[in-house]
C-alpha cells in the first residue's frame, strides 16, 4: 500500500543519512593514514611517481583525475599554495589528497606498488591483508556515492562486493550464508571499521 511505500522511502532516507555520517569518519581516517604512511615512506609527491605503481596507465588516469579535482577546488589552502609556489605543479600529498574523492583515493591505494606500506595501513584498521582493505574501500566508495546521490540503499545489490573473511581480529559477524553482493555486507564492514 502507499503508506508502506512512504514508510520504506523514509526509512531509506534515514539510513542514507546515518551511513553518510559514519562514512565521513572512516574516509577521514583512511585519507590521513594513506597520506601519512606513503609520504613518510616515499616523500610528499609519491602520488606523482609512476615508478611506485603497478599499472602506469591507471597511474595516468589517476593523475588526470587529481589534476581535474585540483582545478575545480575552491579550497583556501589550495589557492594559497598556488599563490606562493609555481613548482611543482601539484601541492604535496597532504594538501592535494585532501581534496580528491574517496574513489580517487581508493584507486591510488589500489595501484600503489609498496605492499608493505599498504599492509601497515590495513593493519591499522585491524584487517589482515591490503587486498581486503582495497575491496572494502571500493565497496565503501559505492555506498558513499549512493548516499551522496540519494540512491536507494534498502535491498541494494553492490557492483563491487567486499571481501568477507570468516574471522577478523575485532568483533566480526558470522558470514555463513551472507550474500556479500548485498548492501548488508558493506554495512558489516562499516560496523567493523568503527
Model-derived features: positions:
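Long, contiguous internal "core" modules enriched in hydrophobic/ aromatic residues
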Residues: 1-194
Amino acid at each position: 500500500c502507499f503508506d508502506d511505500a512512504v514508510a520504506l522511502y523514509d526509512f531509506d532516507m534515514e539510513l542514507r543519512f546515518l551511513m553518510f555520517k559514519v562514512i565521513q569518519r572512516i574516509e577521514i581516517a583512511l585519507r590521513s593514514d594513506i597520506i601519512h604512511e606513503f609520504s613518510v615512506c616515499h616523500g610528499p609527491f609519491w602520488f606523482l611517481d609512476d615508478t611506485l605503481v603497478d599499472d602506469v596507465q591507471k597511474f595516468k588516469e589517476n593523475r588526470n583525475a587529481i589534476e581535474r579535482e585540483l582545478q575545480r577546488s575552491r579550497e583556501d589552502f589550495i589557492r594559497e599554495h598556488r599563490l606562493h609556489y609555481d613548482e611543482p605543479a601539484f601541492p604535496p600529498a597532504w594538501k592535494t589528497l585532501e581534496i580528491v574523492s574517496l574513489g580517487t583515493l581508493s584507486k591510488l591505494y589500489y595501484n600503489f606498488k609498496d605492499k608493505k606500506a599498504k599492509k601497515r595501513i590495513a593493519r591499522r584498521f585491524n584487517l589482515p591483508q591490503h587486498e581486503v582493505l582495497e575491496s572494502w574501500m571500493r565497496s565503501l566508495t559505492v555506498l558513499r556515492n549512493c548516499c551522496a546521490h540519494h540512491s536507494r540503499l534498502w535491498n541494494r545489490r553492490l557492483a563491487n562486493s567486499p571481501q568477507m573473511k570468516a574471522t577478523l581480529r575485532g568483533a566480526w559477524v558470522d558470514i555463513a550464508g551472507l550474500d556479500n553482493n548485498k548492501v548488508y555486507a558493506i554495512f558489516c564492514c562499516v560496523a567493523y571499521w568503527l
